[in-house]
């Protein structure tokens, strides 16, 4: 059993490779309870996303703009998001669709 199982599950709930291609997501990183990534240019000016599994078995999404010195600016957080709402919340915040269908 991999300690990145949660990160892999989050990515599959977002749409897997379709999500990666549609959003320009790259530089994925995972921990025991989270997935983080850089995302492409979007209407919110966010370029970094971290999704964390919390103790209530729901997700917390943190969008921010990382500067070249890795400082976080314009941080927006959404808490207690269910797995079936991840893609809808992502689309609502960034304006990017996560798949064609």
What does each of the following model-derived ranges do?
Residues 1-43, 72-73:
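Negatively charged, low-complexity tracts enriched in Asp/Glu with abundant Ser/Thr
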Residues 57-68:
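Short, surface-exposed beta-strand/strand-loop-strand elements in extracellular ectodomains
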Residues 52-56:
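Short beta-strand micro-motifs enriched in acidic
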């Amino acid at each position: 059993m991999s300690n990145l199982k949660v990160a892999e599950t989050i990515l599959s709930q977002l749409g897997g490779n379709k999500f990666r291609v549609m959003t320009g997501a790259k530089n994925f990183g995972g921990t025991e309870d989270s997935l983080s990534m850089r995302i492409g240019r979007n209407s919110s000016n966010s370029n970094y996303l971290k999704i964390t599994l919390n103790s209530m078995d729901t997700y917390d999404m943190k969008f921010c703009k990382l500067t070249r010195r890795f400082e976080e600016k314009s941080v927006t957080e959404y808490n207690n998001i269910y797995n079936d709402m991840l893609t809808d919340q992502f689309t609502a915040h960034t304006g990017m669709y996560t798949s064609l269908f």
